[in-house]
């Protein structure tokens, strides 16, 4: 851990706990800061706050009292999910208090160089792919950030021989100041989290913060297929490398079903361990990072051919009576479902879809679902998805939940078929999050498998 005197004897307010807030509180305390933690959850139900109090850190729980900011805080470190319209955040900003996120702290103390990955879709899969390839190629890559391992916690023990492979959300990137990765990757940009950012332009700007401090000695990797790329490319000091599944570019690309980097053949696309056009794109982005990091073509190809996916992201669960099950519960929008379907022959696919009704029409999904063997529909959006199925000429059945849908799908399946959970909708009408939805699918698969044995 690098020496950092920035916060020594400075009052710092941590707004919101969760994993990142807890990690930030411990790090700042270690750096000599006078830390106060404020979390909305009651103290009695808040084991993280209880633990921090035992360590001598001041905690204020159960509400967010504005008068707390009457103290002379030098910095606020907020949970990324707390919006900037929050009264505490607004008051801090009005008083001129810098509002940071925990990844900024990670950068300030990290001895390890940082590879930073952001984007609308594919962040977690690509971050995991990159770490796996780097590790197989002889590097020491440490997963961190929005992937479940607080960046500041990982950075505390990372050495200069490690590489922090960091997944970053737009929320986290709004709270950086000096953050400076050596390699940064933007997988793609789609209009998401608009309720938080207010507009697509504001969302893009948040993502673009990733390159704010990069220089010509650093490399920014961009998706050449994105409409915004040409304009954004003119606004960075970083050196540029591109990836594309559709055209030859200065970087990583697909040509005639083969993956290349600057003219060097890496592997066949069909040898990738995970299906779908989106995973070709994820692999190309990974290849760009790997080649820039000095990894051999052999190590890249070996890792990507054996990569089995990430939980809830087109994760292959296995087969029952030669029927394959894929869990893509992270598919919370139409684009994610389209990309999942691109990896399969539709006439063998039984698609489980539906969820929170956000007012979407599913017209854009119609070309992608044509020829499906069957659709099993559930949730608030089922009625609208029925209309899309009818227009695509696809038969459908209804289910009351994912477990019911899994059973119905298996009853419809024949050997060689694929049962794909790729909802194209958020989960919140029926489940707390996509993970719980996906876990129900996994449990249903395991129960069916047990029943067949």
Swiss-Prot record:
GO cellular component term, pick one: cytoplasm
Record field: catalytic activity: UDP-N-acetyl-alpha-D-muramoyl-L-alanine + D-glutamate + ATP = UDP-N-acetyl-alpha-D-muramoyl-L-alanyl-D-glutamate + ADP + phosphate + H(+)
A single GO BP: peptidoglycan biosynthetic process
Cell division is among the record's keywords: yes
UniProt-listed Gene3D superfamilies: Mur ligase, C-terminal domain, Mur-like, catalytic domain, NAD(P)-binding Rossmann-like Domain
GO molecular function: ATP binding; UDP-N-acetylmuramoylalanine-D-glutamate ligase activity
Location(s), subcellular: Cytoplasm
Pathway where this protein functions: Cell wall biogenesis; peptidoglycan biosynthesis
Pfam families named in the record: Mur_ligase_C, Mur_ligase_M, MurD-like_N
Binding site for ATP: 119-125
Highest taxon in the source lineage: Bacteria
Enzyme Commission number(s): 6.3.2.9
Group of enzyme by EC: ligase
Keywords carried by this UniProt record: ATP-binding, Cell cycle, Cell division, Cell shape, Cell wall biogenesis/degradation, Cytoplasm, Ligase, Nucleotide-binding, Peptidoglycan synthesis
Entry's family note: Belongs to the MurCDEF family.
Stated role: Cell wall formation. Catalyzes the addition of glutamate to the nucleotide precursor UDP-N-acetylmuramoyl-L-alanine (UMA).
Protein known as: UDP-N-acetylmuramoylalanine--D-glutamate ligase
Organism of provenance: Streptococcus uberis (strain ATCC BAA-854 / 0140J)
Phylogenetic classification of the source organism: Bacteria, Bacillati, Bacillota, Bacilli, Lactobacillales
């Amino acid at each position: 851990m690098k020496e950092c005197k920035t916060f020594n004897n400075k009052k710092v307010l941590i707004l919101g706990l969760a994993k990142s807030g807890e990690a930030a509180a411990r790090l700042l305390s270690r750096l000599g800061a006078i830390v106060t933690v404020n979390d909305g959850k009651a103290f009695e139900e808040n084991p993280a706050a209880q633990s921090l109090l035992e360590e001598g850190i001041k905690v204020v729980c159960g509400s967010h009292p504005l008068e707390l900011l009457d103290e002379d805080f030098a910095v606020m470190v907020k949970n990324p999910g707390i919006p900037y319209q929050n009264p505490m955040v607004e008051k801090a900003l009005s008083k001129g208090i810098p509002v940071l996120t925990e990844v900024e702290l990670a950068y300030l103390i990290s001895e390890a160089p940082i590879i930073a990955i952001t984007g609308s879709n594919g962040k977690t899969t690509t971050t995991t792919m990159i770490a796996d390839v780097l590790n197989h190629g002889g590097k020491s890559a440490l997963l961190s950030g929005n992937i479940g391992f607080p960046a500041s916690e990982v950075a505390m023990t990372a050495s200069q021989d490690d590489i922090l492979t960091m997944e970053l959300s737009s929320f986290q990137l709004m709270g950086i100041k000096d953050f400076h990765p050596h390699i940064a990757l933007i997988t793609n940009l789609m209009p998401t989290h608009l309720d938080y950012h207010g507009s697509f332009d504001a969302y893009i700007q948040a993502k673009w913060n990733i390159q704010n401090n990069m220089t010509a000695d650093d490399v920014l990797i961009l998706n050449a297929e994105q409409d915004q790329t040409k304009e954004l490319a003119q606004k960075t000091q970083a050196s540029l490398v591109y990836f594309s599944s559709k055209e030859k570019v200065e970087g990583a690309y697909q040509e005639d079903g083969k993956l290349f980097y600057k003219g060097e053949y890496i592997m066949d696309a069909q040898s990738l361990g995970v299906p779908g056009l989106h995973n070709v794109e994820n692999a190309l982005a990974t290849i760009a990072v790997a080649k820039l990091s000095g990894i051999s073509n052999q190590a890249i190809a070996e890792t990507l051919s054996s990569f089995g996916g990430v939980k809830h992201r087109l994760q292959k669960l296995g087969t029952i009576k030669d029927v394959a099950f894929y869990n893509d519960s992270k598919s919370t929008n139409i684009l994610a479902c389209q990309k999942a379907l691109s990896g399969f022959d539709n006439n063998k696919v039984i698609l489980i879809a539906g969820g929170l009704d956000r007012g979407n029409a599913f017209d854009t999904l119609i070309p992608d679902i044509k020829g499906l063997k069957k659709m099993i529909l559930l949730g608030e959006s089922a009625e609208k998805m029925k209309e899309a199925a009818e227009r695509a000429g696809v038969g459908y059945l209804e289910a009351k939940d994912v477990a019911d849908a899994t059973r119905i799908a298996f009853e419809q399946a024949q050997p060689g078929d694929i049962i794909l959970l790729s909802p194209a909708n958020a989960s919140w009408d029926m489940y707390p999050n996509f993970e719980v939805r996906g876990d129900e699918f996994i449990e249903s698969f395991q129960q069916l498998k047990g029943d067949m044995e």
